[in-house]
Amino acid sequence: MSKKFFAIQIILILSFVGCGDKNDYVGDLNNELPDGKGIMTYEDGSKYDGEWKEGKRYGEGTLTFEDGAKYEGEWKNGEMDGTGEFTWSNGDKYEGEWKNGKKNGQGTIFYHDGSKLEGEFRDDSPWDTSLYDK
């Protein structure tokens, strides 16, 4: 077997295997990157269904995690950014503003026991909030 033939076989095998990338994408592409509407299923079991720009989550979309947690809302540069709702697998839910993937701005956490934490969040932490019992 010639070296050239062997090299071509290796290239074909790597292109089918994907060089270890086990994410699965179905949707619009531009320059071989997700761009437009599409669904990405990640190796860890999470799944994003929404808009893409230059290979990053951008616009409106939903990210569902394997444990059942889910974010629905706005994205920018691959991060939760804008208005969105995050629901943890235990039923607690945050509704409000996000910046660079963190709770930032006005929002409310609704706890599964009926209580809620409402007010301003900064850098993913409560800043000026009030806790209300059920």
How would you describe each model-predicted region?
Residues 1-2:
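N-terminal secretory signal peptides that target proteins for export/translocation
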Residues 5-6, 13-134:
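Glycine/tyrosine- and acidic-biased, solvent-exposed loop/turn segments at the edges of beta-strands
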